């Protein structure tokens, strides 16, 4: 059977949307016991994870990676990521090892493969051999083209696509062992890998198709038919008073999945049908014809898509009732409620479904200890035990491809956490190539001649990762969150447990709180609920650990601030009275965390209530159990005694907080 190809044209009659109303109800359920799901991969122990990680990325041989060698190699890994070099498997080290990343080994700041391989020409060809079912081919083509442009914008390299024959860079998707001796590992973990420039497999780039490939912000679903043909689903969307985060068949009697292409379907009425095998197939040789169920394959009748007869795990179906006779087939779309992992081969969720006697009409984490959202792929999990993980934000194909193509140009991994070539995946909404990346690639190929001739885009310096002891940094926010002190500057953070110790970092904010904008104005922790509250512009975000609370961000007005307050300077929860203080300009407000509203009698002037505290603050923090509050502005801070409100110290942030 031929390899996965681009989707064919969609055929089949247009079916009108027939709204029947919401009939589903969710049964409230007590907390479920933790169970073992069939087909679930057991998580590795910390030691198993460390040995595999250090073997793969730092060359520690599995058979001789004993405690002594392990400790030394761990220190190398910790140094690479800016972690305390303890040589121990502490929590921060394990957290870093469990993050999704590239499959190539690590080195240091922009670096090159051994012997610095590079292309000996500037005209580079690429060919897309296969596609992921997660995105339509046009979106995949565009993501790869934009990823190559990241590098052509700053070098003389020019990339052109060919559709036949051998290209310099062959691009494909695969699962587990996929023919190059470097297997992938299922969902999450290793995302992709690429080979250094050269002949044969040189430059080839492979992407793990057990991942959910998106543009970084959830499923990208292009609808067919309806009254919004070719537009994209809007998730979540509102229908009959309920929000939907994926395609649904609610309101239909034919089982076809649909979505709204605007948030409010009831207001706008814009919709289309989501990819589904009953509407169309892609690739294959059936020119987009829908599946025909049941169909016969090798003498067996199939009532749904299958992976039988294939070694790559892709779901397919016959488009006539007898594949053995007609040899007509197509691949089943996997962008509409398709599951990832589990034991259902990508089959879609079925709602409602029964689990341990309770009904669920949406994805749930019930029964799991890792908090991952899942669903059943039949109406009754208890009977059938068929399930899969629900789609999440997925991984940006553009960002991962831009990183891998950096390897295909000759760059290794960078130790700079702000660089595209850093090994750990972090979604960045408004991506810009960093100075570290530009310096590395231009050392190999030089600068783009278009810039010198004035025919290219106006050059702009890429962002530089700040160094807290070498620069005078004014922090955007400082807060104690879950017992650690965090310093925020643009898209970076530094963290420490104790003041005066040099903070660990820089790290990317998006690694911990991915939905935040690239720059915040203020942050504090509400200790009563252990939730972190972030402010940026006229909005605020609330997180439980790294999970954004539903419905956020919200406008500052919903917190009780007046409409003319378009940003805040600082905020902190005061241990003296458990109230939260919000500062903007020369005023401050007091918020009651218990009653969830502003206290009356505010705002007040900072100068009238706080001894020696200036206006336009940068940050405020009250360290737990310390009895003092700290007010930051510019390069200095004021330390106030909480009971007397007396200023007891004026000091330097660098020397007293950053260990410089």
UniProtKB/Swiss-Prot annotation:
<keyword id="KW-0482">Metalloprotease</keyword>
<feature type="binding site">
    <location>
        <position position="211"/>
    </location>
    <ligand>
        <name>Ca(2+) 1</name>
    </ligand>
</feature>
<feature type="glycosylation site" description="N-linked (GlcNAc...) asparagine">
    <location>
        <position position="573"/>
    </location>
</feature>
<keyword id="KW-0597">Phosphoprotein</keyword>
<dbReference type="InterPro" id="IPR018486">
    <property type="entry name" value="Hemopexin_CS"/>
</dbReference>
<dbReference type="GO" id="GO:0007162">
    <property type="term" value="P:negative regulation of cell adhesion"/>
</dbReference>
<feature type="active site">
    <location>
        <position position="404"/>
    </location>
</feature>
<dbReference type="GO" id="GO:0030017">
    <property type="term" value="C:sarcomere"/>
</dbReference>
<dbReference type="GO" id="GO:0005739">
    <property type="term" value="C:mitochondrion"/>
</dbReference>
<dbReference type="GO" id="GO:0071498">
    <property type="term" value="P:cellular response to fluid shear stress"/>
</dbReference>
<dbReference type="Pfam" id="PF00413">
    <property type="entry name" value="Peptidase_M10"/>
</dbReference>
<dbReference type="InterPro" id="IPR036943">
    <property type="entry name" value="FN_type2_sf"/>
</dbReference>
<dbReference type="GO" id="GO:0048771">
    <property type="term" value="P:tissue remodeling"/>
</dbReference>
<feature type="glycosylation site" description="N-linked (GlcNAc...) asparagine">
    <location>
        <position position="642"/>
    </location>
</feature>
<feature type="binding site">
    <location>
        <position position="211"/>
    </location>
    <ligand>
        <name>Ca(2+) 3</name>
    </ligand>
</feature>
<feature type="repeat" description="Hemopexin 4">
    <location>
        <begin position="614"/>
        <end position="660"/>
    </location>
</feature>
<feature type="signal peptide">
    <location>
        <begin position="1"/>
        <end position="29"/>
    </location>
</feature>
<dbReference type="GO" id="GO:0008270">
    <property type="term" value="F:zinc ion binding"/>
</dbReference>
<dbReference type="GO" id="GO:0032526">
    <property type="term" value="P:response to retinoic acid"/>
</dbReference>
<dbReference type="GO" id="GO:0007507">
    <property type="term" value="P:heart development"/>
</dbReference>
<dbReference type="InterPro" id="IPR006026">
    <property type="entry name" value="Peptidase_Metallo"/>
</dbReference>
<dbReference type="GO" id="GO:0071347">
    <property type="term" value="P:cellular response to interleukin-1"/>
</dbReference>
<feature type="binding site">
    <location>
        <position position="209"/>
    </location>
    <ligand>
        <name>Ca(2+) 1</name>
    </ligand>
</feature>
<feature type="binding site">
    <location>
        <position position="413"/>
    </location>
    <ligand>
        <name>Zn(2+) 1</name>
    </ligand>
</feature>
<dbReference type="InterPro" id="IPR000585">
    <property type="entry name" value="Hemopexin-like_dom"/>
</dbReference>
<feature type="region of interest" description="Required for inhibitor TIMP2 binding">
    <location>
        <begin position="414"/>
        <end position="660"/>
    </location>
</feature>
<dbReference type="InterPro" id="IPR013806">
    <property type="entry name" value="Kringle-like"/>
</dbReference>
<dbReference type="GO" id="GO:0055093">
    <property type="term" value="P:response to hyperoxia"/>
</dbReference>
<protein>
    <recommendedName>
        <fullName>72 kDa type IV collagenase</fullName>
        <ecNumber>3.4.24.24</ecNumber>
    </recommendedName>
</protein>
<keyword id="KW-1015">Disulfide bond</keyword>
<dbReference type="InterPro" id="IPR021158">
    <property type="entry name" value="Pept_M10A_Zn_BS"/>
</dbReference>
<feature type="repeat" description="Hemopexin 3">
    <location>
        <begin position="565"/>
        <end position="613"/>
    </location>
</feature>
<keyword id="KW-0325">Glycoprotein</keyword>
<dbReference type="InterPro" id="IPR021190">
    <property type="entry name" value="Pept_M10A"/>
</dbReference>
<dbReference type="GO" id="GO:0071230">
    <property type="term" value="P:cellular response to amino acid stimulus"/>
</dbReference>
<dbReference type="GO" id="GO:0045906">
    <property type="term" value="P:negative regulation of vasoconstriction"/>
</dbReference>
<keyword id="KW-0037">Angiogenesis</keyword>
<feature type="binding site">
    <location>
        <position position="186"/>
    </location>
    <ligand>
        <name>Ca(2+) 3</name>
    </ligand>
</feature>
<feature type="disulfide bond">
    <location>
        <begin position="233"/>
        <end position="259"/>
    </location>
</feature>
<keyword id="KW-0106">Calcium</keyword>
<feature type="binding site">
    <location>
        <position position="193"/>
    </location>
    <ligand>
        <name>Zn(2+) 2</name>
    </ligand>
</feature>
<feature type="binding site">
    <location>
        <position position="200"/>
    </location>
    <ligand>
        <name>Ca(2+) 2</name>
    </ligand>
</feature>
């Amino acid at each position: 059977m031929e390899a996965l190809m681009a989707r064919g044209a969609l055929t089949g009659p247009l079916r009108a949307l027939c709204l029947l109303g919401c009939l589903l109800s969710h049964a409230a359920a007590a907390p479920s016991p933790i169970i073992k799901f069939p087909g679930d991969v057991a998580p590795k122990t910390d030691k198993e994870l460390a040995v595999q990680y250090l073997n793969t990325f730092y060359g520690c041989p599995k058979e001789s990676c004993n405690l002594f060698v392990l400790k030394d190699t761990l220190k190398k890994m910790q140094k690479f990521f800016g972690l305390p070099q303890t040589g121990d498997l502490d929590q921060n080290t394990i957290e870093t090892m469990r993050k999704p990343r590239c499959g190539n080994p690590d080195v240091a700041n922009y670096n090159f493969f051994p012997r610095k391989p590079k292309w000996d020409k500037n005209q580079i060809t690429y060919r897309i051999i296969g596609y992921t079912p997660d995105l339509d081919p046009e979106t995949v083509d565009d993501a790869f083209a934009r990823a190559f442009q990241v590098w052509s914008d700053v070098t003389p390299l020019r990339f052109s696509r060919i559709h036949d024959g051998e290209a310099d860079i062959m691009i494909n998707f695969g699962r587990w062992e996929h023919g190059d001796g470097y297997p992938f590992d299922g969902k999450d973990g290793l995302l992709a890998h690429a080979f250094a420039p050269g002949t044969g497999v040189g430059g080839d780039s492979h992407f793990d198709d057990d991942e959910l490939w998106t543009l970084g912000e959830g499923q990208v679903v292009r609808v067919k038919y309806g009254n919004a043909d070719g537009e994209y689903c809007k998730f979540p969307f509102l229908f009959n008073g309920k929000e939907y985060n994926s395609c649904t068949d609610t309101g239909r009697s034919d089982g076809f999945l649909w979505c709204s292409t605007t948030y409010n379907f009831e207001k706008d009425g814009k919709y289309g049908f989501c990819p589904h095998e009953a509407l169309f197939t892609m690739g294959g040789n059936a020119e987009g014809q829908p599946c025909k169920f049941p169909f016969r394959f090798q003498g067996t009748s199939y009532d749904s898509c299958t992976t039988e007869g294939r070694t790559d795990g892709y779901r397919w179906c016959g488009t006539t009732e007898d594949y053995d006779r007609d040899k007509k087939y197509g691949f089943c779309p996997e962008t509409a409620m398709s599951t990832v992992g589990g034991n259902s081969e990508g089959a879609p969720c079925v709602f409602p479904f029964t689990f341990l006697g309770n009904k669920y009409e949406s994805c749930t984490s019930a029964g799991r200890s890792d908090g991952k959202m899942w669903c059943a792929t039949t109406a009754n999990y208890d009977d059938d035990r068929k399930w899969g993980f629900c789609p999440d934000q997925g991984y940006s194909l553009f960002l991962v491809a831009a990183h891998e193509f950096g390897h295909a140009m000759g760059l290794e991994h960078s130790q700079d956490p702000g660089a595209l070539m850093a090994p750990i995946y972090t979604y960045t909404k408004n991506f810009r190539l960093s100075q570290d990346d530009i310096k590395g690639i231009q050392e190999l190929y030089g600068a783009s001649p278009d810039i010198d001739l004035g025919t290219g885009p106006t050059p702009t310096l890429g962002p530089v990762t700040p160094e807290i002891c070498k620069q005078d940094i004014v922090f955007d926010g400082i807060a104690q969150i879950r017992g650690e002190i965090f310093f925020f500057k643009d898209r970076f953070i530094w963290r420490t447990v104790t003041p005066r110790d040099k903070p660990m970092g820089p790290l990317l904010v998006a690694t911990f709180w991915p939905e935040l904008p690239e720059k915040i104005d203020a942050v504090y922790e509400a200790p009563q609920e252990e939730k972190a509250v972030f402010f940026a512009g006229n909005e605020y975000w609330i997180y439980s650990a790294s999970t954004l609370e539903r419905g956020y961000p919200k406008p500052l007005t919903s917190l009780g601030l007046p409409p003319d307050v378009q940003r805040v300077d600082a905020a902190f929860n005061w241990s003296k009275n458990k109230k939260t203080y919000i500062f903007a300009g020369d005023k401050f407000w007091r918020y009651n965390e218990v009653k969830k509203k502003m206290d009356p009698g505010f705002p007040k002037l900072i100068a009238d209530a706080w001894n020696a505290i200036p206006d336009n603050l940068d940050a405020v923090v009250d360290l737990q159990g310390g009895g003092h509050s700290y007010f930051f502005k510019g390069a200095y801070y004021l330390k106030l005694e909480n009971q007397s409100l007396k200023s007891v110290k004026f000091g330097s942030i660098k020397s007293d907080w950053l260990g410089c």
